[in-house]
C-alpha cells in the first residue's frame, strides 16, 4: 500500500498458568518498537489476533478471568496500553466506545451461541490515520472459525 504500511500478526498466547508471559511481554515490547519505526516513515494499519482483551467491556466475564486467564492479565493489558500510548488507536473501540461485541468464542459449551466471548482481534491505526477510517465492524455473523472477521474501511 503506497500511503501506509499494513501489518498483520498473530500475537503469541501466554498459555495456561501464564507460563509464557515473559515471552509475551518481550514480544509486545519488540512489536511496539517495530510499529513505531514503521510509523516514523508512514502511517500504519496493524491487524491481528492480539490475544488480549484490553478493557472489561472486551470480554464476557472479566472478574473471573482477570490475572488468571491468558489474554486478560494486567501485563498483557499493559502491553496493549503501551502500544496505544505509542501513537496507535484501537479503531473499532474508537468508533464504538460503549458497544459490547466479541471476535472470539471458545469452541466449548456453546459459548458462541450464548455470546460468552472475548474481543481479541484488533485493527490499530496510527493516530494520524484515524481521520481516514470510514468504518469498522466485527462480523459476528461469519462462521467457520472460533474467531470472526473484523473489518476496517479507509476513505478513498
Regions found by a protein language model. Give the residues of each.
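Active-site regions of metal-assisted phosphoester/phosphodiester hydrolases
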Residues: 1-156
Amino acid at each position: 500500500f503506497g500511503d501506509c504500511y499494513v501489518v498483520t500478526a498473530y500475537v503469541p498466547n501466554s498459555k495456561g498458568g501464564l507460563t509464557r508471559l515473559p515471552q509475551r511481554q518481550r514480544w509486545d515490547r519488540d512489536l511496539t518498537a517495530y510499529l513505531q519505526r514503521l510509523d516514523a516513515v508512514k502511517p500504519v494499519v496493524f491487524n491481528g489476533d492480539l490475544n488480549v482483551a484490553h478493557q472489561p467491556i472486551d470480554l464476557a466475564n472479566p472478574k473471573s478471568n482477570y490475572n488468571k486467564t491468558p489474554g486478560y492479565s494486567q501485563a498483557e493489558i499493559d502491553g496493549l496500553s503501551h502500544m496505544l500510548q505509542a501513537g496507535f488507536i484501537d479503531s473499532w473501540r474508537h468508533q464504538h466506545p460503549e458497544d459490547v461485541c466479541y471476535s472470539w468464542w471458545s469452541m466449548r459449551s456453546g459459548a458462541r451461541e450464548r455470546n460468552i466471548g472475548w474481543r481479541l482481534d484488533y485493527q490499530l491505526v496510527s493516530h494520524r490515520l484515524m481521520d481516514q477510517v470510514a468504518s469498522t465492524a466485527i462480523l459476528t455473523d461469519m462462521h467457520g472459525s472460533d474467531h470472526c472477521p473484523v473489518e476496517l474501511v479507509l476513505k478513498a
